[in-house]
Every structure is written in structure tokens, then in C-alpha cells.
Regions:
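C-terminal solvent-exposed extensions
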Residues: 104-183
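Short helix-initiation/N-cap motifs at beta->coil->alpha
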Residues: 1-4
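Flexible, polar/acidic helix-loop-strand segments at domain edges
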Residues: 6-94, 98, 177
Length: 183
């Protein structure tokens, strides 16, 4: 759940991030309002969620959804770097509780706390966290949702998976098995 990211940001006391562009969007149908100025500053959980959700097809990223994905990855990188600072170890119980409330798992709270403590005490380093984007082909479509809001159609960005490259990614980055997946 993306909402957990905002809750963790608030528990951290905010995340310093360079918002790459002005972000304005209003969608009363979804009760979604985004109003973020470009620049480096401390983001609250709500600010972070606005930055992560922004995609406005008409006024959004030049490279569509791929631009949004790059911003999301840059934000999560900044968040992990700041989260793992030793001063945040005092907030470990709060982080574990947010995780427990938002992630479906059979781990006990004790298990979650054990993994969190291991991460904070050197088991996880920001330079070892890698984000990858699903291999894809960009696609565009006209949205009728936007037409209801402002009386016109708007081009929306989407991606479609490239299955052969996706299998290669699974085999080289994600699979713990020696066996190669072929389908």
C-alpha cells in the first residue's frame, strides 16, 4: 500500500527530496489534489504521496509514466538513505507497526522488529538497494475521465510489458534459483 510510505515519512519526521518539477493537478472525482513546487525541501507524508502520485497526462512528465517512475525511484532512494540513519533506530517500533498494519504477511511483530533491527545495524546499506523498472514499451491513450473534468480528452501515458526482457530481469535480478525461467 502506497499509503504506508506516507506514514513512514511522517514517522521519520519528513524526507528531504528535490521535487523535480512543479506539480499541480485537481481531480474532484477522486478527491485528489496535488500542489507541489519544484525544489529541495523537507516533504511530509502528504507531500510525498502527492509527488509519488503525480502523472497528469497533459501537463505531466515529458516521458510520461517513465518520468513518474524515475521520480518514484529517486524518492524511495532518498527515503531509504534517510531512514537508515542511526538516529531513526529509536523509531523502529513505530516503523514496524506501520509495516504490520499495511503489509499482508505471516511474520510476527517480533520477526518484523528483528529484520528492522538487522537493517539498522548494518544488514542493509543504501548503496545495496537497487530499483529496476519493468522492461516495457511506452504507450499512450486518450482518457475519457479527464474529458469529464475539463470538457476535453487528454493523452495518458501507459506502459506495456516486454515479456522476453522481463523474463531476463527475473532470472538475473529477482530469482534466487539456479533454474532459468523460460515462461
Amino acid at each position: 500500500e502506497w499509503e504506508a510510505v506516507g506514514q513512514i515519512v511522517d514517522a521519520m519526521g519528513g524526507v528531504w527530496f528535490d521535487v523535480p518539477r512543479d506539480m499541480y493537478y485537481s481531480d474532484p472525482l477522486q478527491n485528489l489534489y496535488i500542489n507541489q513546487k519544484a525544489g529541495y525541501r523537507l516533504l511530509t507524508g502528504d507531500d510525498a504521496m502527492q509527488v509519488l502520485r503525480f502523472r497528469d497526462g497533459a501537463n505531466g512528465y515529458k516521458d510520461g509514466d517513465l518520468g513518474r517512475i524515475k521520480t518514484q525511484q529517486a524518492f524511495l532512494t532518498a527515503m531509504v538513505e534517510q531512514l537508515l540513519k542511526i538516529e531513526n533506530i529509536a523509531k523502529i517500533n513505530e516503523f514496524a507497526e506501520v509495516f504490520r498494519e499495511n503489509v499482508e504477511t505471516d511474520l510476527t511483530l517480533q520477526n518484523i522488529l528483528w529484520f528492522a533491527k538487522a537493517a539498522f545495524t548494518g544488514g542493509l546499506k543504501p548503496e545495496n538497494v537497487e530499483f529496476v523498472t519493468m522492461p516495457n514499451t511506452p504507450a499512450y491513450a486518450y482518457s475519457s475521465t479527464t474529458s469529464r473534468l475539463n470538457g476535453r480528452y487528454s493523452e495518458q501515458s501507459y506502459v506495456t510489458p516486454n515479456t522476453s526482457q522481463l523474463l531476463e530481469l527475473v532470472n538475473t535480478k529477482l530469482s534466487p534459483y539456479a533454474e532459468v525461467f523460460t515462461r
